[in-house]
C-alpha cells in the first residue's frame, strides 16, 4: 500500500486538529493583557500539537521502523539553535517577558516561508488541509505575540537585536531518500520550535497571573 494512501486514526487526528483552530479570537483587538496571553497560549498549543502529530504521521508513512532511532540521532541541525533561546522551562524562567516574546517571534517568523510548501510533503495533501491554513495560523500567532510586545514594550528594557534564522523549504521529491530525511529533520525542528514557543508563553502567563493550577 502506498504511503499516505489510507486514513490512520492519527491522520484523522491531524485533520481534526487543523479544523479546531480557536475561532473566538480570530484577531487581536484591544483587550486585557490576561486575555492576550490566554489567546496566544491557546494558539501555540494547537500549533505544537498539530506539528507533533504531523511529525508522527510522516514518520509512520515514510520512515521504516528499524531506521527511526538512527535517523532521530542524526536529524537536521535546527537553525533555532543558533540563537540564545532558552531550551526549557527552567531556562525560560531566567528571561524577561520581552526577551521570551522576542525569541518566540523569531521562531515563528522562521517558519512562515517553509510551511507554505508543507502540503506537498504528503502524497495525500489532506494532512493540514492546505499549506495556507498552517501559514494563516502562524500569522495569527505572530500577530498575537506582536500585540503582547506592544503592550509590554514601554515597561521593559529593549534587548539586543536577534539574528533571524531561516529554514529551507520542504522538499517535494519524496522518492529521494535524502529528501525524505531532510523533511523528517525539518518536521522535527518545526515541532521543537513550536514547543519552545508554547513553553515561553506558558511561563509568562503563569508568572504574571499566578495561576495555582498552572502546568507547563
Swiss-Prot record:
Keywords for the protein's UniProt record, in alphabetical order: Disulfide bond, Hormone, Metal-binding, Secreted, Signal, Zinc
Binding site for Zn(2+): 46, 198
Gene Ontology biological process: animal organ development; growth hormone receptor signaling pathway; negative regulation of apoptotic process; negative regulation of gene expression; oviduct epithelium development; positive regulation of gene expression; positive regulation of growth; positive regulation of receptor signaling pathway via JAK-STAT
Disulphide bridges: 78-189, 206-214
Entries under PROSITE patterns matching the protein: SOMATOTROPIN_1, SOMATOTROPIN_2
Signal peptide limits: 1-25
A single GO molecular function term of this UniProt record: growth factor activity
Pfam families (UniProt xref): Hormone_1
GO cellular component, one term: extracellular space
Cell compartment(s), UniProt: Secreted
Family: Belongs to the somatotropin/prolactin family.
Role played: Growth hormone plays an important role in growth control.
Protein name: Somatotropin
Species of provenance: Anas platyrhynchos
Amino acid at each position: 500500500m502506498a504511503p499516505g494512501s489510507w486514513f490512520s486514526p492519527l491522520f484523522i487526528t491531524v485533520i481534526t486538529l487543523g479544523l479546531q483552530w480557536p475561532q473566538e479570537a480570530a484577531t487581536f483587538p484591544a483587550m486585557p493583557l490576561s486575555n492576550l496571553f490566554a489567546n496566544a497560549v491557546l494558539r501555540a498549543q494547537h500549533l505544537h500539537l498539530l506539528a507533533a502529530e504531523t511529525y508522527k504521521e510522516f514518520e509512520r508513512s515514510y520512515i521504516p521502523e528499524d531506521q527511526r532511532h538512527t535517523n532521530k540521532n542524526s536529524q537536521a541541525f535546527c537553525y533555532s539553535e543558533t540563537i540564545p533561546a532558552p531550551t526549557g522551562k527552567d531556562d525560560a524562567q531566567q528571561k524577561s517577558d520581552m526577551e521570551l516574546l522576542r525569541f518566540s517571534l523569531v521562531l515563528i517568523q522562521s517558519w512562515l516561508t517553509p510551511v507554505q510548501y508543507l502540503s506537498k510533503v504528503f502524497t495525500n495533501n489532506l494532512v493540514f488541509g492546505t499549506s495556507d491554513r498552517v501559514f494563516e495560523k502562524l500569522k495569527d500567532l505572530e500577530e498575537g505575540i506582536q500585540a503582547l510586545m506592544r503592550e509590554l514594550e514601554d515597561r521593559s528594557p529593549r534587548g539586543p537585536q536577534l539574528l533571524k534564522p531561516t529554514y529551507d523549504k520542504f522538499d517535494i521529491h519524496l522518492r529521494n531518500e535524502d529528501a525524505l530525511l531532510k523533511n523528517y529533520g525539518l518536521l522535527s525542528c518545526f515541532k521543537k520550535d513550536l514547543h519552545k514557543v508554547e513553553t515561553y508563553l506558558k511561563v509568562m502567563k503563569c508568572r504574571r497571573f499566578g495561576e495555582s493550577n498552572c502546568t507547563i
